[in-house]
Amino acid sequence: MSFFEQQEEEVHSLWVEKYRPTKLDDYVGNENLKAKVKGYIESGDIPHLLFFGKAGTGKTTLAKLIVKNIDSDVMIINASDENNVDTVRNKVKNFASGVGFKKYKIVILDEFDYMTPNAQALLRNLMETFSRHCRFILTCNYIEKIILPIQSRCQSFQIVPPTKKDVAVQIAKILKQEEMQFNPTDLVPIVDGYYPDIRKIINTCQLACVGGV
């Protein structure tokens, strides 16, 4: 097995990726927002979107579900790693301005609150310049770190985490799929300790099972 095949296998073995929802109907919570998203998908037309809320609550998952169901070319950038003007000027602009063969080009900028103010200002210009065929989906933990001109150009939605009960039900389903023996009461301290970070809860459960904790 090559290094890259090994890395891919490791990613797929992570429960948080293995059990990431692949259909909008499998996405738990935020029912009003799901209804709006279904409307976007059915019409084949979406605005610029800004999803904000606490870490691990499904912002990126929802963004990926949208682009999966919209006829589009997609670029995904993690702004916590690439957060400067060069990223916007080179990577994003080149993608947005290039020739495309689908209805839209969609750029997902994950953890956008890490982007510098100058980079955000430049992105605002790109949102206007390429508005005919390019859409941006931004996710962030702290909406107050996003400049107002970008907020005003997006439909903004707060992602509310599912209830603790719903999270526990989802975790139980994962454990059953993995054929793990467990007592439902064992989930209580993990869910209570890391809620509302669903990603952290899933990772902790996997670590506990693998490590025999």
Describe each PLM feature range.
Residues 1-157, 165-166, 176, 184-192, ...:
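P-loop/Walker A NTP-binding region and its immediately flanking N-terminal helices
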